[in-house]
Amino acid sequence: MQPQLNFYPSGPETTTAMTGLERQITRSGLKQGFITPSFISRLVCSALLCISAVLLSPVKAAAPIAAGFETLQAADGTDKPLEVAIFYPTEAVPQEVDLGPFKLNIARGGAVAGQGLPLIVISHGNGGATLSHHGTAIALAQAGFVVAAVAHTGDNHADQSRAASMMDRPRHISRVIDHMLTQWSGKDHINATRIGVFGHSSGAFTALAIVGGTADLGRIAPHCQQRPGDYPCQLVARQPAGTAAMVAAMVQPDRDTRVRAAVVAAPALGFTFTQASLGAISVPIQLWRAEQDVVLPQPWYVEPVRAALPKPLDYREVPNAGHFDFLAPCTPRFAAMAPPLCSSQPGFDRVAFHREFNAAVVGFFRVALKP
């Protein structure tokens, strides 16, 4: 039995108070026509009924925030336009949508919800796509972030013509930021002082470069002579011009000072960074390492970055995780298409890990990009 809420006191204090009110009205000469003590009693009771109706009426809950979604192209100077997937907070109702081999719970074309929103640009790894980290992007959007996930020209699932040309990537990040702040239809919802970057593998190298990290590219050739089987060295070896020519053609990118925080997961070419090249980074960094990463194995990738970055550092190591466990959990269709990207160590639960991973990424950016 539900407890009864009593908004109608009927004790002696109430009776006395109402009788006194009636006497005052009578003495003041207002007891004329329908304004009688009984009318006042009914008036007071009506007021109490109105108050109780307000108190007992259900409060309309705020609409749950879903992930809105759209795609666009961002100009990149004389190069081909960049393909970008945008995720953002919306109050529209989401639906499960099939996008290629992925299933996303999104509200396509929903109105942007909120003002002063932070912007996160996602940089995928070698051969990746705009949807490689769609789970993390959706989690960020549901938490009130605008997310722009770029497909890097020449280094994506459909085009590997510039797979080893790492120095184009930071420029792509800057061009996407330019577009989001000046051209995107929802640009007025973004706070331009709250911009971060998320990167995995080659995207993590990109994130370090865009916040001021300077790679010593001269370290590539000797490292690859000693470890030709490392995945980055295999990429370099496939370049027609050879390692020396490729490195000579690379130009160090400029730092983009608009980027105020970075999440860096399993960074490629970590051995090219030193304390001198990373020590000047002044923005908060969250660094992730997969314990069972055989693509970028220790101690040549995450470890040099961890040692060189300024302290304190938000460093996370994931037990039993592999390099590709930072990618969104796979659908059965995608697992059949790309088994290496979807295979985890025995006993590792990628879905459960991503609940923790996404929460940690959201929490980091909330603090690092606090207005």
Task: Describe the residue ranges of each PLM region.
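Alpha/beta-hydrolase fold nucleophile elbow
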Residues: D188-G199
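Short substrate-entry loop that stabilizes the transition state in hydrolases
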Residues: G109-L117, I122, N126-A158, V294-P297
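Short beta-strand/loop motif that positions the catalytic acidic residue
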Residues: I281, L287-R289
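Domain-level recognition of soluble alpha/beta enzyme cores
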Residues: A62-I122, D314
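Short glycine-enriched nucleophile-adjacent loop
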Residues: L181, A204-D216
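Acidic catalytic loop of the alpha/beta-hydrolase fold
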Residues: G270-F271, Q292-L296, F324
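Short alpha-helix in the alpha/beta-hydrolase fold that links the catalytic acid
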Residues: P297-R306, C330
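Alpha/beta-hydrolase active-site loop
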Residues: A163-D188, A209, A221, Q225-P232, ...
